[in-house]
Amino acid sequence: MYSYEDRLRAVRLYLKLGRRMSATLRQLGYPTKNSLKAWLAEFERNQDLRRGYQRIKRQYTDEQKQRAVDHYIEQGYCLSHTIRSLGYPSREALRAWIRDLRPEFARTVVGSSAPTVARSRLEKQQAVIALNLRVGSAKDVADTVGVSRPTLYNWQHRLLGKVPLKPMTKKKGDTSLEQRHEALLRELAELESQNQRLRMENAILEKASELIKKDMGINPLELTSREKTKVVDALRVTFPLANLLCGLKLARSTYFYQRLRQTRPDKYTQVREVIRTIFEDNYRCYGYRRIDSALRLGGMRVSEKVVRRLMAQERLVVRTPRRRRFSAYAGDPTPAVPNLLNRDFHASAPNTKWLTDLTEIHIPAGKVYVSPIVDCFDGLVVAWNIGTSPDANLVNTMLDHAVRTLRPGEHPVIHSDRGSHYRWPAWIRRTENAQLTRSMSKKGCSPDNAACEGFFGRLKTELIYPRNWQHVTLKDLMTRIDAYIHWYNERRIKVSLGGRSPIEYRHAVGLMSV
């Protein structure tokens, strides 16, 4: 449900854009067309939108009330006939009007009783026990419980089966009453035990959700010993320790060992904070290997296994959902060139092998297209361009930026797929002027350009997929993508480069001045 501010923002933007429905939905990312039409109709009718739902209570005049009461008296004292004839009010309202205006005609329902209250199985058990152990009459027991005498005997029939009528004189040695009494007491004890067990299981789930931030659907047996110990400590005041340990399948010795460990100071407190900071500052996309490299670069040496354990305990998990790929293939405007790289994406020097491609990023506000050039030497994004249309200008401008970074004598191979952007005359003319050697993948074979596809995968799994892009405009998205690529070149750790970013690696090997 959209708030008042969201609905009013959508209507005002729609009017500001000249009542263009598609432009409004593309910029905001919400709502549906029918919802926006309904909001607009309400706004034009009231010059405002309702701030919430209000329950309207219908009001009747004194004349309407008197007319209904008179009709009831004149037409034979029938509530249904009066309501059908006049079309109002409800039966309860009409009865109230009769009591107020003509109380002498108000009818009292004979034999009415208090509303029926649902009784638990435990209450029924106790009532049946009292019935069988009574000294007085069954009516006295029924009055004490608050039910009728037939109801009491119905409970007995359901719980004990059909009980034969007792003879007026008790035979010697007849113990059926005592046996039923003992059976009822045993069943009552079992029900109380089962009730306590269910209460304990529910309390365990609630505490696991509260203390350990677990989902209510989690299986308590899948918790770690440390987490189980926290739950037991929180519930010891309410439930016996033995029952809690049994319910969580936790050995007594393990429980006291974990309690002892928790009293000791955590020697990884500082490391936990540093790991959490690194994870959050780097788009929540660092796994344990790059976290370990970042710690080493910061002068903090910790075992890789410790890093993995601490990340698991802090629940620092990289999310990697998948989306469909964008295809730029549009026929064969010019002949394709051969595949010169043949999936060899290793380069001994910068600016010898370049890769390029085009990808689509879709959010509620619309689509954005990213066109980069990746250097096979270290994965540096040499140049890139971001736009809202996958046209020739997007890729041609990107190529012009990349060519300006070349030094005299550098003429790399530029590899792409068979998309139409790389087969148009303007692209071919630019590559010939810069003396670049063109190379192309086979048709529909993404592994032939796997290194560039890998960059797109990292961009989407680290920046796009883990976040909610509702209410984000395309301009803001392009700004964030540009900032991500700068971070990718300057700060993002690559394990294959010794835990450095591409630019840091070039500084380290002397290929770029500081």
From Swiss-Prot:
Chain's role: Probably involved in the transposition of insertion sequence IS1353.
Swiss-Prot/TrEMBL GO biological process terms: DNA integration; DNA transposition
InterPro entries: Homeodomain-like_sf (IPR009057), HTH-like_dom (IPR025948), Integrase_cat-core (IPR001584), RNaseH-like_sf (IPR012337), RNaseH_sf (IPR036397), Transpos_IS3 (IPR048020), Transposase_8 (IPR002514), Transposase_IS3/IS150/IS904 (IPR050900)
Coiled-coil annotated residue ranges, if any: 172-216
NCBIfam families the UniProt entry points to: transpos_IS3
Membrane-spanning ranges: none
GO MF entry, a single one: metal ion binding
Remarks, miscellaneous: IS1353 is an insertion seqeunce sometimes found in In2.
Record-annotated Integrase catalytic domain positions: 346-510
Family the UniProt entry places it in: Belongs to the transposase 8 family.
Pfam families xrefs: HTH_21 (PF13276), HTH_Tnp_1 (PF01527), rve (PF00665), rve_2 (PF13333)
Protein name per Swiss-Prot or TrEMBL: Probable transposase for insertion sequence element IS1353
Keyword line: Coiled coil, DNA integration, DNA recombination, Endonuclease, Hydrolase, Magnesium, Metal-binding, Nuclease, Plasmid
SUPFAM superfamilies associated with the record: Homeodomain-like, Ribonuclease H-like
Binding site for Mg(2+): D357, D417
Organism annotation: Shigella flexneri
Superkingdom: Bacteria
